[in-house]
């Protein structure tokens, strides 16, 4: 027997073909959501309040401080919030202190700051009753970036950008004449020396002394026509504020507010970290030759001689002298004068030999920012100086350019940070209001409550959850869709890219994605590469960079240890990493002398003693969904992409079956998705019911078991998911079972025995049959319909509300005008459908009448009024009816009344919701797929007796076209087919993990073990004639899923329906009950056939000839001849449009007489009045 047995949860055992031991458990897969939100509640909010307080008024008399905050209990639990269509939130209260600096009086008060949406255990938010997910956003990290530019003459230039988290950009660039320029906040460019003068280095000499002599600086100084700091400040002011009278003071305050004010300019933690890392001496001096000796400032000892090359060892030796807190080497303090800031600037500089000088004599000055501390969030003059120094160094090939698509330069903004940014906007709006109120109100009697207006804060949070591009309606088709949605990374959204502007490079797979972002799972279409998925083992660090785990290799012994280090993309660039499948001996050392490994973007073969790290697992490259595809290594990546995406569209079936050939990820994905019920504490099952499971906690105290509390776990029964599929949980534990923390107590939708079960294991043959599986179509046996193998349950929600109108309130009633008793048979006394009733298209669900405007009564109506009194009141029927294709069984009805204290939108008195459930069997036109991107539409369902059968008489379930395999290169499906057949014969489930699964030889051996031929082909007999087919056929078990694209949702036909108001043409699309567009090319087709009358009919009476179409309808009903068509409405619209452009357009008849449009219209109105239709109103 090949492989070993692995237990997944309580119920499932699989034979795994994995050869590599798992060193690291998979992390909790929705940690990216929950951890980020916890950070926000613990630290993010506190940071915000610290940033904003104290708020002082303009005179400095009053100051308002935010001391502490607390979150109360949510008003409704999660389930009730969903049911009542409200947000699941908790009240946020803040302790505020108001200090009167004149009198010294202090007032403390707790202020309510609005309700704050809470995250559920499963990483989602309930907003207005709907479950939503906040997708993490991939953005460029704030830092300084250098890039190489080649101009149109092929000359090399350098560009640099300082990007903050928020605030003005600072850009440096060179031009064809070798002059260095700066742009401040995307304005016109200025010579770079103007900025240096404005910082307080006024003369040419000072600038040259500071940055060192070089030709770029010389050219720039020649171009610069300002001579001192004052002129430079005025020059900058004129660029930033053209048209305003410049003064030195204004210029200084403008620059201070643009760059040096922490409220306006923010690099954030991550920006400061990246900036210090980029401008640090270490990487800049590597492999350079010193132009001055490095001396210990304390002792005067020479550590490195002039002319020595700073290789790794020497660099490590001098680092302590460059980095220590005091007496650093090369540190100097500059005192700028007349500049923006008068403060002293601490920098660090080292002289090296210019590597581009052939004689090796010219010196370069490398200036560092003197290690600005991590708590300085704004840019400092030292940062600007050292980034300009780096810029000039780079022109002499010292330092390196940055790749902006590298994951070391892109970071994630998860829920917590996105919320924090939104909250900050609300708070800063509130701050303005507080300041204004401070100056208006009486300072002696004012309280904090009177100053604070919480509206802007609430509004900004509401706006974020309700309408941000990153707050999305959760994909709840099945648990995998739910899980993937929570782990999604989007480069779109506010502050990100746009689809149209994103180029090819951003979308492409980058070497730094390895183990961080899945190279497979991304949508097809305009968003390809902009929306990605987090890899299975990846984590996000405190700066928002994605880290991947690696096993450390002990440098002394060469052993691969089980010590795991999480590395970010730029940390990993310093190491050589071996693949997870490198063979190890018993001592955990590499078997081979030479090992295939990765270093930055290259795959290299190196000797084993040079390796620093080793991959944790072969599946760390791919995402949770991709890791569910067995034999992924045998599929072409384009098809694997489709396979990963289509699994998310699988509809939950009535009788789910876990795959016979799995990958071992099914259990983890099911458990972490949030669809299953998970046990929170160790214990014993006391009671199991369909709707709840009771667990008695058990803890060990002094070696004895002690019983604790009884926990109740509620189960969701037949609820509607966001996508209208059925969300149902079934217990999989029994009374008396011992359970541990984290164990699955109940399966969710699309789960079986704790494992993800998206489809069914069916017997598949690769063969053609009468041409029915042409173009990927699928032929299916009727058994799958009869036995409900692919039957799914769908629940749709319909609602009707009774509002107050100008003419009086609407009423929900059984008394509906002009409706027979037959239509009311399933309604109760209030006019609401009874639960359990079977309804079809057009049936009434909720009877409702709306008051009509009072019209002039005819004589007969007046007589009726006189006889029956007020009975014949004017109401019209506005009942809620079942739409086309919406028929089914009424599952549940919910009624909300304003009188009962239910929260309803303004103007609504009563709300009724009806849930209709449909049981959809599979039929022709439904879309199905395997896990390898092999998708198709069912073209024929054959009776069982007509299906080809095996020698033992078993008819096969599905026939697929063999031509779908070779050109698509998804051979994984063939391996799955064979291994599945062998596993079914042996009565086992197997696991073939990605990149470490069953090899070809393993499959053949398992087939032999099952007593089958090695090529896994078999003779098939035609079910109709009983004769054997000419050739043997590959038959086996494949896991096939039914996708959410069902023909019932798409099939549509229209007789008459609504028309567009302006053109009077039928609307388009199923949702609007629209027609089919007969376009330009279709018109040509009918012209080619000479079918003039058909064409005229289609363009007039079937479309927008308003009177003609009613006359035609009348003629058909009465059996008369169809009348002559009139003038189409769109033709009149065209004429009007041309006339509105000032053209004189006239219509002429065949004998050249002018036709007056007005007369035509009057005739139409007369005809319309005869026919009793309203031309003005669209039908």
Curated annotation (Swiss-Prot):
Enzyme class per UniProt: transferase
Family to which this protein belongs: Belongs to the RNA polymerase beta chain family.
SUPFAM superfamilies: beta and beta-prime subunits of DNA dependent RNA-polymerase (SSF64484)
Tree of life domain: Bacteria
Quaternary structure and partners: The RNAP catalytic core consists of 2 alpha, 1 beta, 1 beta' and 1 omega subunit. When a sigma factor is associated with the core the holoenzyme is formed, which can initiate transcription.
Annotated organism of origin: Oceanobacillus iheyensis (strain DSM 14371 / CIP 107618 / JCM 11309 / KCTC 3954 / HTE831)
Protein keywords: DNA-directed RNA polymerase, Nucleotidyltransferase, Transcription, Transferase
Any matching Pfam family: RNA_pol_Rpb2_3
Function according to Swiss-Prot or TrEMBL: DNA-dependent RNA polymerase catalyzes the transcription of DNA into RNA using the four ribonucleoside triphosphates as substrates.
MF term (GO), any: ribonucleoside binding
PROSITE patterns, A to Z: RNA_POL_BETA
Alphabetical list of PANTHER family matching this protein: DNA-DIRECTED RNA POLYMERASE I SUBUNIT 2
Annotated EC: 2.7.7.6
Disulfide bond positions: none
GO BP field: DNA-templated transcription
Name of the protein this chain belongs to: DNA-directed RNA polymerase subunit beta
Keyword Cell division assigned: no
InterPro entries to which the protein is assigned, alphabetical: DNA-dir_RNA_pol_bsu_ext_1_sf, DNA-dir_RNA_pol_bsu_external_1, DNA-dir_RNA_pol_su2, DNA-dir_RNAP_su2_dom, DNA-dir_RNAP_su2_hyb_sf, RNA_pol_bsu_bac, RNA_pol_bsu_CS, RNA_pol_bsu_protrusion
Protein encoded by which gene: rpoB
GO cellular component: DNA-directed RNA polymerase complex
Reactions listed under catalytic activity: RNA(n) + a ribonucleoside 5'-triphosphate = RNA(n+1) + diphosphate
């Amino acid at each position: 027997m090949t492989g070993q047995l692995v237990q997944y949860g309580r119920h499932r055992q699989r034979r795994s073909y994995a050869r590599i031991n798992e060193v690291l458990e998979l992390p909790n897969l929705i940690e990216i959501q929950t951890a980020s939100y916890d950070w926000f509640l613990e630290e993010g909010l506190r940071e915000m309040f610290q940033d904003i307080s104290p708020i002082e008024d303009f005179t400095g008399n009053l100051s308002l401080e935010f001391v502490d905050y607390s979150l109360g209990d949510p008003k409704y639990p999660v389930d009730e919030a969903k049911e009542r269509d409200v947000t699941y939130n908790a009240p946020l209260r803040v302790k505020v202190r108001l200090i009167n600096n004149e009198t010294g009086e202090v007032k403390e008060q707790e202020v309510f700051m609005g309700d704050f949406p809470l995250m559920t255990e499963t990483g989602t938010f309930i907003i207005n009753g709907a479950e939503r997910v906040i997708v993490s956003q991939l953005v460029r990290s704030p830092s300084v970036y250098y890039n190489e530019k080649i101009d149109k003459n092929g000359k090399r230039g350098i560009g640099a950008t300082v990007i903050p988290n928020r605030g003005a950009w600072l850009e440096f660039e060179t031009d064809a004449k070798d002059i260095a320029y700066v742009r401040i906040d995307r304005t016109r460019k200025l010579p770079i020396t103007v900025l240096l003068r404005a910082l307080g280095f006024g003369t040419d000499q000072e600038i040259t002394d500071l940055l060192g002599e070089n030709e770029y600086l010389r050219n720039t100084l020649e171009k610069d026509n300002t001579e001192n700091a004052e002129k430079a400040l005025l020059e900058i002011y004129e660029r930033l504020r053209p048209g305003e009278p410049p003064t030195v003071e204004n210029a200084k305050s403008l620059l201070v507010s643009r760059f040096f004010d922490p409220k306006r300019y923010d690099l954030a933690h991550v920006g400061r970290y990246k900036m210090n890392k980029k401008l640090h001496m270490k990487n800049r001096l590597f492999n350079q030759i010193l132009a001055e000796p490095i001396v210990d400032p304390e002792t005067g000892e020479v550590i490195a001689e002039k002319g020595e090359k700073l290789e790794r060892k020497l660099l490590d030796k001098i680092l302590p002298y460059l980095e220590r807190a005091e007496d650093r080497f090369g540190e100097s303090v500059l005192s700028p004068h007349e500049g923006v800031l008068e403060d002293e600037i601490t920098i660090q500089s080292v002289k090296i030999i210019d590597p581009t000088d052939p004689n090796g004599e010219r010196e370069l000055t490398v200036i560092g920012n003197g290690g600005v501390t991590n708590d300085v969030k704004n840019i400092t003059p030292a940062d600007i100086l050292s980034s300009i120094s780096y810029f000039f160094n780079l022109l002499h090939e010292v330092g390196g350019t940055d790749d902006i698509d590298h994951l070391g330069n892109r970071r994630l903004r998860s829920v917590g940070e996105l919320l924090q940014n939104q909250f900050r906007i609300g708070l800063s709006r509130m701050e303005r209001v507080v300041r204004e109120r401070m100056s208006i109100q009486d300072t002696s009697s004012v309280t904090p409550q009177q100053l604070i207006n919480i509206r802007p804060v609430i509004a900004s949070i509401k706006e974020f959850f309700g309408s941000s591009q990153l707050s999305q309606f959760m994909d709840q088709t099945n648990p995998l869709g739910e899980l993937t949605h929570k782990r999604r990374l989007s480069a779109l959204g506010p502050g990100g890219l746009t689809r149209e502007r994103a180029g090819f490079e951003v979308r492409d797979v980058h070497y730094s994605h390895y183990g961080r972002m899945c190279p497979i799972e991304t949508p097809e279409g305009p968003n390809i590469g902009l929306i990605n998925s987090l890899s299975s083992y990846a984590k996000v660090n405190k700066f928002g960079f994605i880290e991947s785990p690696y096993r450390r290799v002990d440098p002394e012994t060469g052993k691969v240890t089980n010590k795991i280090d999480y590395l970010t993309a730029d940390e990993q660039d310093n190491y050589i990493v071996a693949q997870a499948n490198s063979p190890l001996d018993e001592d955990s050392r590499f078997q081979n002398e030479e090992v295939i490994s990765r270093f930055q973007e290259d795959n290299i073969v190196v000797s084993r003693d040079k390796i620093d790290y080793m991959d944790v697992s072969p599946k760390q490259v791919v995402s949770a969904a991709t890791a569910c595809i067995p034999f992924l290594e045998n599929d072409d990546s384009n098809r694997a992409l489709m396979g990963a995406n289509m699994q998310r569209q699988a509809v939950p079936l009535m009788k789910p079956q876990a795959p016979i050939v799995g990958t071992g990820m099914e259990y983890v994905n099911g458990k972490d998705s949030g669809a299953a019920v998970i046990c929170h504490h160790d214990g014993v099952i006391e009671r199991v019911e369909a709707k709840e499971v009771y667990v008695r906690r058990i803890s060990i105290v002094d070696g004895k078991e002690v019983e604790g509390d009884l926990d109740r776990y509620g189960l969701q029964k037949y609820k509607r998911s966001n996508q209208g599929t059925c969300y149902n949980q079934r217990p999989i534990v029994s009374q008396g079972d011992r359970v541990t923390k984290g164990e699955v107590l109940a399966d969710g939708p699309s789960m079986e025995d704790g494992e993800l079960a998206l489809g069914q294991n069916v017997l598949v043959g690769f063969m053609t049959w009468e041409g029915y599986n042409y173009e990927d179509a699928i032929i299916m046996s009727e058994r799958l319909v009869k036995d409900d193998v692919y039957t799914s349950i769908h629940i749709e929600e319909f609602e009707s509300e009774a509002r107050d109108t100008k003419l009086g309130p609407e009423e929900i009633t059984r008394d509906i005008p002009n409706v027979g008793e037959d239509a009311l048979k399933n309604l109760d006394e209030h006019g609401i459908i009874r639960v359990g009733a079977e309804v079809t298209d057009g049936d009434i669900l909720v009877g409702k009448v709306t008051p009509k405007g009072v019209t002039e009564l005819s004589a007969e109506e007046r007589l009726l009024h006189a006889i029956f009194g007020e009975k014949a009141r004017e109401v019209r029927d506005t009942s809620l009816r079942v739409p086309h294709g919406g028929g089914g069984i009424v599952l549940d009805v919910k009624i909300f009344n304003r009188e009962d204290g239910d929260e309803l939108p303004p103007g609504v008195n009563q709300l009724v919701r009806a849930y209709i459930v449909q049981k959809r069997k599979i039929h022709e036109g439904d879309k199905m797929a395997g896990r390898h991107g092999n998708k198709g539409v069912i073209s024929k369902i054959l009776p069982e007796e007509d299906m080809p059968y095996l020698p033992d008489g078993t008819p096969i379930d599905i026939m697929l076209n063999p031509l779908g395999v070779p050109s698509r290169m998804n051979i994984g499906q063939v391996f799955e087919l064979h291994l599945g057949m062998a596993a079914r014969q042996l009565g086992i489930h197997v696991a073939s993990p990605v990149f470490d699964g069953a090899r070809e030889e393993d499959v053949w051996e398992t087939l032999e073990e099952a007593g089958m031929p090695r090529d896994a082909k078999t003779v098939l007999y035609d079910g109709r004639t009983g004769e054997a087919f000419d050739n043997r056929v590959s038959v086996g078990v494949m896991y096939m899923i039914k996708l959410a694209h069902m023909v019932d949702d798409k099939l549509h036909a229209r007789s008459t329906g609504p028309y567009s108001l302006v053109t009077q043409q039928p609307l388009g699309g199923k949702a609007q009950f629209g027609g089919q567009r007969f376009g330009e090319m279709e018109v040509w087709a009918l012209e080619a056939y000479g079918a003039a009358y058909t064409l005229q009919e289609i363009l007039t009476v079937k479309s927008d000839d308003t009177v003609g179409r009613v006359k035609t309808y009348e003629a058909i009903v009465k059996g008369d001849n169809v009348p002559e068509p009139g003038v189409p409405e769109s033709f009149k619209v065209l004429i009007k449009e041309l006339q509105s452009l000032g053209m004189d357009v006239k219509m002429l008849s065949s004998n050249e007489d002018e036709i007056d449009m007005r007369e035509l219209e009057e005739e139409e109105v007369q005809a319309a009045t005869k026919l009793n239709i309203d031309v003005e109103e669209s039908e």
